[in-house]
């Protein structure tokens, strides 16, 4: 009997789009990447967009402007998504004047307008981060 390897040799992981790539992990501005991708070919999109908190890597804008900008990104993601594809959209909270706004609730109408259906909602509760107490 021949022994099988514990882990199979993984498929190559690319950092730029290629029609032959089965796995692409892109780190950067999605708008720079998405223009390269043909319509309807992506089966799974996993992303964690900026939360509009005004961190050093993002500019803080009004929540309406933020959602408008993200809607343009979502529109392009829907364009490249295959008919049997899924989007996993990981977001946190937007905070303004001490009030917490769960971003997933604000995004829901945007996804619905683009014909997508919510299939699952996962809430990760943890005791550290932006709003944790000591």
Go through each PLM region and give its residues.
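Core catalytic lobe of class I
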Residues: 1-134
């Amino acid at each position: 009997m021949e022994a099988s390897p514990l882990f199979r040799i993984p498929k190559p992981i690319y950092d730029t789009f290629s029609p032959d790539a089965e796995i692409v992990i892109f780190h950067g501005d999605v708008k720079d990447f998405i223009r390269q991708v043909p319509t309807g070919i992506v089966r799974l999109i996993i992303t964690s967009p900026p939360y509009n908190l005004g961190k050093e890597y993002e500019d803080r804008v009004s929540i309406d402007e933020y959602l408008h900008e993200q809607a343009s990104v979502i529109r392009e993601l829907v364009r490249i998504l295959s008919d049997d594809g899924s989007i996993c959209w990981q977001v946190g909270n937007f905070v303004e004047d001490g009030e917490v706004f769960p971003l997933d609730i604000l995004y829901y109408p945007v996804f619905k307008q683009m014909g997508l259906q919510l299939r699952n909602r996962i809430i990760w509760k943890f005791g550290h981060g932006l709003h944790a107490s000591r």
